[in-house]
């Protein structure tokens, strides 16, 4: 049974699909793998972040992007936020935004 990859909002979808072409190509490849094999691909594709959040690591000649996602029932994963990586860690404010969105999606807000 396949997984479904969706976005938290149209804004998140548009921001993600506006990634530079090399990064976007890698992101789309990873999401295809997730649809087939599930989100637990392991590094270098996906990694746990804690608190029920995970990341997709998309690399291209232009740099690295990270998309934070959570999983919900019926084999669905929701991309909560995407950011171009500028340092070693995802900025705290982006993680807080992702966590708040996760709580909303899961009905805990």
Question: What are these model-predicted stretches?
Answer:
Residues 67-69:
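Hydrophobic/aromatic beta-strand elements that line small-molecule binding cavities or substrate pockets
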């Amino acid at each position: 049974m396949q997984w479904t990859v969706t976005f938290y909002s149209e804004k998140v979808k548009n921001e993600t699909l506006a990634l530079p072409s090399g990064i976007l190509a890698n992101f789309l490849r990873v999401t295809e793998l997730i649809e087939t094999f599930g989100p637990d691909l392991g590094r270098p594709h996906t990694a746990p972040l804690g608190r029920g959040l995970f990341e997709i690591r998309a690399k291209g000649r232009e740099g690295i992007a990270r998309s934070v996602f959570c999983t919900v029932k019926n084999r669905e994963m929701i991309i909560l936020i995407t950011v171009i990586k500028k340092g070693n860690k995802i900025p705290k404010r982006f993680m807080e935004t992702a966590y708040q969105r996760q709580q909303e999606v899961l009905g805990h807000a």
